[in-house]
Amino acid sequence: MQRRTIVRTASGALLIAATAGGVLYGCASAPADRADGQRAEAMLKSSFKAHGQATLDRLDQDETQRLCSEYAGRALPQPVAERIEKANLATIRFPADGKLVGDWKSGEKIAQSGRGFQYSDDPTKPAGANCYACHQLSPQELSYGTIGPSLYQFGKRRGFTDETRRYAWQKIYNAQAFNACSNMPRFGHRHILTDAQIRDVVALLVDPASPVNR
């Protein structure tokens, strides 16, 4: 039988490495789990090669990723979840000019785009957020994922308030502040999206004129 070790990379992706032994999460002891994780990490680092903008530092984990990898496939203890959320909440930064809402039409384009950070992508061009891969947003788009909750009528359901706009900004900037070990990328914290792009995605969610709220 093979043992599967799950490692969350710096880019937020989950990598699964197979090693000899049983199932990682289950009856295995904590020291054995750590040893397997260390072997898997070493194997990943030795097998990956830098290619363009996809450099090896993407395999380096921060504290949040390390903890999420450690508890992958197991219930996350409440104290650990609170520790992760508190640490990530502290990373959130609001724009200096205080403007949180941009252009929802640009936000729709960003939500549709999955480009960015792959070795074959042009690093000089802005990345997309690929929101539709996990969420329903505009009803006009029939192809969407269901890993995340539906965001259709996000603003209408929550209210077109400053509180809703601030929450949307924070959630996009760093989702781990609200849901420890979320699969959602930390778009602001990891510099995937610019402040201007985050404004536009916020607008897609909270602008009454956006198709999301029609």
Question: What do the PLM-derived regions correspond to, one by one?
Answer:
Residues Q2-L14:
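Bacterial N-terminal signal peptides that target proteins for export
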Residues F117-S120, Q140-Y144, P211:
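Secretory-pathway/luminal and periplasmic proteins that interact with or process carbohydrate-rich
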